[in-house]
């Protein structure tokens, strides 16, 4: 390696980090339950779905980050500047519902982990998750963006180790893994499961947030950029290159976790009943692979809940600021968004039911995040010389069409009682 290469790498390192925060959305408790269920029911059959999902996610998150870097604004802010007040309020309401639904699933997941590990009642588990997430948000809100990112990366490492540890006890079949890369189905139920996995690929709040994260990160690392500096060819090209590297590694790790969960279930839980809930999956892992592996899995689930709910609250703050031009203290937002989850936990609602309801709300929000992203990044008036080229435009719109169609399909199945 030459001295020049080393210097270039050192310059890129400070620019890495935002994608690892966004990647937490791809390993939240809802994803855990979906991938465990897929592996337990169908073995290695649907590995290819997760591989395709990860590729889709990389493209979507890159476009969000690119939009933020080129314009210096977040996706919500750009949309807010182009809408009349009634439109902005309506768009904010749907985005806020999506953010609340996301937070609901993540708080419940963290509370379940505390219940599995320590027997903590679900309501008090939700309170603890909320308090810890507020502590994490205090770090981010105190102008310590790099420290916040470091904590989230640390939690992502715990998630990875917690969810993949079981593979050392029950290694997957190499031939099964290779066979799972061939796109195919096994009956109509497997099509539904695949649609669930692929349809949940892109979380709306991660799309909104990534366009803001890159600018918060740059301001923290390098200081606020002037318009001329931001749009200088060398500076922006370096940022975009770092962003591609950041997204590749962050989402590769998230994809590895998701695929690993499916492989673990395929190797150790195939054919077992009751694995369609997080509690059932934990019980099956503990009984099949031993209590130590079950405990490590629950620790990974706890890290997943803590990290994802902190990131979700961060996203909600950016959505409100961009669309309504109101900067509510993030602690106040955290307390407000925590209330629905605590009410559901306190009422004794079945956690799996709550997760299903939250996923339906997320499905409604997907088109409102992805379609504007595609339109803006294809608009030369917005992106200038960094407008998506034709292959990227076609790829992006095809991915968006597939994801939106699958989410609408899942909403239909859920509302008609077929999902």
Model-derived segments and their meaning:
Residues 1-30, 86, 157, 193, ...:
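Membrane-interface "cap" regions at the ends of multi-pass membrane proteins
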Residues 92-96, 117-139, 157-162, 327-343, ...:
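Transmembrane alpha-helical segments of multi-pass small-molecule transport proteins
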Residues 57-70, 214-218, 222-229, 252-280:
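Extracellular/periplasmic helix-exit of transmembrane alpha-helices
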Residues 156-182, 191-212, 373-381, 406-418:
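Hydrophobic alpha-helical segments and their helix-loop junctions in multi-pass secondary transporters
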Residues 86-88, 123-126, 292-294, 298, ...:
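Loop-to-transmembrane helix boundary motifs in multi-pass membrane proteins
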Residues 22, 49-82, 91-97:
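Juxtamembrane transmembrane-helix boundary signature
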Residues 56-61, 86-106, 114-140, 199-200, ...:
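Helix-loop-helix module between adjacent transmembrane segments
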Residues 2, 34-39, 62-87, 139-146, ...:
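Flexible loop linkers connecting adjacent transmembrane helices
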């Amino acid at each position: 390696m030459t001295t020049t290469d080393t210097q270039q790498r050192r310059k890129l390192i400070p620019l890495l980090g935002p994608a690892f925060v966004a990647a937490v959305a791809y390993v939240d408790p809802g994803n855990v339950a979906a991938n465990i269920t897929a592996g337990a029911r169908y073995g290695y059959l649907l590995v290819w779905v997760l591989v395709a999902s990860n590729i889709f996610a990389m493209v979507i998150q890159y476009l969000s980050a690119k939009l933020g870097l080129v314009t210096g604004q977040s996706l919500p802010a750009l949309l807010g500047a182009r809408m009349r007040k009634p439109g902005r309020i309506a768009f904010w309401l749907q985005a806020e519902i999506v953010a609340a639904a996301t937070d609901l699933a993540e708080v419940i997941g963290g509370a379940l982990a505390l219940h599995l590990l320590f027997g903590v009642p679900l309501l008090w588990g939700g309170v603890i998750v909320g308090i810890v997430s507020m502590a994490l948000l205090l770090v981010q809100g105190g102008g310590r963006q790099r420290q916040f990112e470091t904590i989230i990366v640390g939690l992502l490492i715990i998630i990875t180790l917690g969810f993949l540890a079981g593979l050392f006890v029950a290694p997957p079949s190499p031939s099964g893994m290779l066979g799972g890369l061939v796109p195919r189905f096994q009956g109509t139920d497997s099509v539904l499961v695949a649609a669930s996995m692929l349809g949940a690929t892109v979380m709306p709040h991660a799309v909104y947030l990534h366009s803001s994260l890159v600018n918060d990160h740059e301001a923290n690392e390098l200081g606020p950029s002037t318009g001329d500096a931001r749009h200088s060819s060398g500076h922006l090209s370096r940022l975009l290159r770092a962003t591609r590297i950041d997204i590749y590694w962050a989402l590769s790790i998230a994809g590895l976790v998701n695929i690993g969960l499916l492989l673990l279930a395929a190797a150790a839980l195939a054919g077992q009943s009751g694995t369609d809930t997080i509690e059932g999956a934990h019980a099956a892992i503990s009984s099949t692979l031993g209590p130590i592996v079950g405990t490590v899995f629950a620790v990974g689930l706890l890290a997943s809940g803590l990290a994802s709910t902190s990131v979700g609250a961060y996203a909600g703050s950016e959505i409100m600021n961009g669309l309504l031009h109101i900067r509510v203290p993030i602690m106040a937002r955290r307390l407000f968004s925590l209330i629905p989850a605590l009410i559901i936990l306190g009422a004794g609602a079945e956690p799996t039911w709550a997760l299903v309801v939250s996923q339906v709300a997320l499905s409604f929000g997907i088109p409102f995040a992805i379609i504007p992203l595609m339109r803006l990044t294809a608009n030369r008036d917005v992106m200038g010389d960094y407008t998506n080229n034709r292959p990227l435009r076609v790829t992006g719109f095809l991915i968006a069409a597939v994801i939106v169609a699958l989410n609408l399909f899942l909403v239909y199945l859920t509302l008609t009682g077929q999902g």
